[in-house]
Amino acid sequence: MKKFALFFIVLVSVFSLSAEAFLSVNDLESAKIVERVEFDGVFIVGAEGKHVTVEEADAKEAPDGEVFNLRIKLEGSGSAKHRHIELNAKKGETLKVYLISSGEDVRNLAVVNKDTGAEIGVLDAPGKNDSIGIASIEIPADGTYLLYSKNKGINIYLVICE
């Protein structure tokens, strides 16, 4: 019984240290998303005429050495209705997003509390001629959060909240 209790404590510890939300484009397949689609507890939400695309792309390397061969294209401005990524997060966790603008200019990825509609912050997506950016923000309260472009396209490669 003691061995089982010790195993249970270790198991709980491992799961409590794992990421609450994780989405890597490397785990996806090419697709045109026109509805709410779940990937291991994280949702990509598109709509007819306001779709999100997962597509193959030239390999891009992030500053930490992670290499991506696909990208999630938000395809333009998003909202609570479409063109967003949705995930659950807990107060105090850090949301980290690997991203880049689809244009030459820096673009803004809004992080919005789904329940209140409050924008908790903006993550900068570097211009497409730069390296993939890694932007992060601390989650202020338990809840569901939306990530969407405030203006024009942004490519997303990895979303992790831990």
What is each residue range found by the language model?
Residues 146-155:
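Short beta-strand-plus-loop segments that form exposed binding edges in beta-rich domains
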Residues 88-96, 143:
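Extended extracellular/luminal ectodomain segments enriched in beta-structured repeat modules
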Residues 104-119:
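Short, surface-exposed beta-strand/strand-loop-strand elements in extracellular ectodomains
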Residues 4-14:
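Sec-dependent N-terminal signal peptides
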